[in-house]
From Swiss-Prot:
Keywords: Cell inner membrane, Cell membrane, Membrane, Nickel, Transmembrane, Transmembrane helix, Transport
Name of the gene encoding the protein in the UniProt record: hupN
Protein name: Hydrogenase nickel incorporation protein HupN
Membrane topology note: Multi-pass membrane protein
Residue ranges, Periplasmic side: 61-63, 132-149, 237-243, 314-333
Chain segments annotated as coiled-coil in the UniProt record: none
Task of the protein: Involved in nickel incorporation/metabolism into the hydrogenase apoprotein.
Sequence similarity: Belongs to the NiCoT transporter (TC 2.A.52) family.
Provenance organism: Bradyrhizobium diazoefficiens (strain JCM 10833 / BCRC 13528 / IAM 13628 / NBRC 14792 / USDA 110)
Keyword Transmembrane helix: yes
Single GO MF descriptor: high-affinity nickel cation transmembrane transporter activity
Cellular compartment(s): Cell inner membrane
Subcellular location, principal: membrane
Stretch forming the signal peptide: none
């Protein structure tokens, strides 16, 4: 028999302490997982880059000219990752998946893997002599048409969906401010009645419901060998094969290309997750940030998708001069446009913070509380 007996009040107190302790342990495990996720992801990517470079050094340590060519292939991957179609597709899908409660840090990785799979296969075919540089005109033309069509169509569809969502979010935002609604339940109720367009277009967003669904999309995007980086990589690989290099020697170039591209595209999706997480701390802030970024997404997707679509039309119909010269120039410098898109989203995030604090939180007398987690610091790699 126990030397004492617990009263009902003591039992309730003990049960409450145990519940709080369990909740604290779950919170700590969640925090640890949030910190470990990006570290594991980027640790693996950095390891992949190191392995690719170790492979290159093992093959070409005594051939500095070829090592310089290997460096060029890796830089091609870094540069190709910031092509405008990559950035626009990844950022839009990350925003969509964050809406459903996901943390799609790896969306950029899967997109890059799908994209680089095409390059790896094409390089292998070249190295094996199945396709020669002089006889791949038809294959290149078909691949270019498919890749450009998929890229332009996807971005224009995304622009149309985001435009409908932007109009709906704006109506919801105005209604929330007019009615003074700031609680999550109230905003969710408003968001559930955003009109027929959002309900009709919802299934299109559900086509990409997990980060790995970006792999086939990246593969389709990669079918167009019409960018300078991809053509340059294939030329490097073909030149080495023509000099009598083995398959292992040639395949190191697409490996370096893929490693560099995956690193940058994954960094892009991870940074976007961090940006969206800031917005999701407060329901009203979430709505405001969605409004800001959706507007930027519409502008970016329309601009890039329009450039690609018009470029495709111009090439098919042999149009030249005037505005078509400008369109050709823009299509040839999409990597620079991609860097501008990253800058645009960063500026939109900063403006969203400043305007929210001055116009929204300030006018309502509510402090813009911040939630500082180690995940936020880790994700901003």
């Amino acid at each position: 028999m126990l030397p004492f007996s617990m009263t009902g009040l003591e039992k309730d107190h003990t049960r409450g302490v145990l519940i709080l302790a369990n909740a604290h342990r779950r919170s700590e495990r969640s925090r640890t997982a949030s910190c470990a996720g990006p570290a594991v992801l980027f640790g693996g990517l950095i390891t992949a880059n190191i392995v690719a470079w170790a492979w290159a050094f093992a093959l070409f340590a005594d051939r500095p000219v070829v090592m310089a060519t290997a460096l060029l292939a890796w830089v091609f991957g870094l540069r190709h990752a910031v092509d405008a179609d990559h950035i626009a597709a990844i950022d839009n899908v990350v925003r969509s998946l964050m809406q459903t409660g996901g943390t799609p840090r790896s969306a950029g990785l899967y997109f890059a893997l799908g994209h680089s799979s095409v390059v790896v296969v094409a390089t292998m075919l070249l190295a094996l002599g199945v396709v020669s540089l002089g006889g791949d005109g038809l294959l290149k033309e078909i691949g270019s048409f498919i890749g450009a069509s998929v890229s332009a169509l996807f971005l224009l569809v995304i622009a149309a969906i985001n435009l409908a969502i932007f109009a709906s979010l704006w109506r919801t935002f105005r209604k929330a401010r007019e009615q003074g609604i700031r609680d999550a339940a109230g905003l969710d109720a408003l968001l559930a009645h955003r009109g027929i367009l959002v309900r009709l277009l919802g299934p299109m967003f559900r086509l990409v419901t997990k980060p790995w669904h970006m792999y086939p999309l990246g593969f389709l995007f990669g079918l167009g060998f019409d960018t300078a980086t991809e053509i340059g990589l294939l030329s490097i690989s073909a030149s080495e094969a023509a000099r009598g290099a083995s398959l292992a020697d040639v395949m190191v170039f697409p490996a370096l290309f893929a490693a560099g591209m995956a690193l940058v595209d994954t960094a892009d999706s991870t940074l976007m997750v961090s940006a969206y997480r800031w917005a999701f701390v407060d329901p009203m802030r979430k709505l405001w940030y969605n409004l800001t970024i959706t507007g930027a997404s519409v502008a970016v997707a329309l601009f890039i998708g329009g450039i690609e679509a018009l470029g495709l039309i111009g090439n098919r119909l042999d149009l030249s001069g005037g505005v078509w010269t400008l369109i050709d120039a823009l299509n040839e410098s999409l990597a620079n446009v991609g860097l501008a898109v990253i800058a645009l989203f960063a500026i939109a995030w900063l403006l969203s913070i400043v305007l929210y604090r001055r116009l929204i939180a300030g006018s309502s007398g509510l402090a813009d509380t911040e939630v500082l987690e180690c995940a936020d610091a880790t994700e901003a790699v």
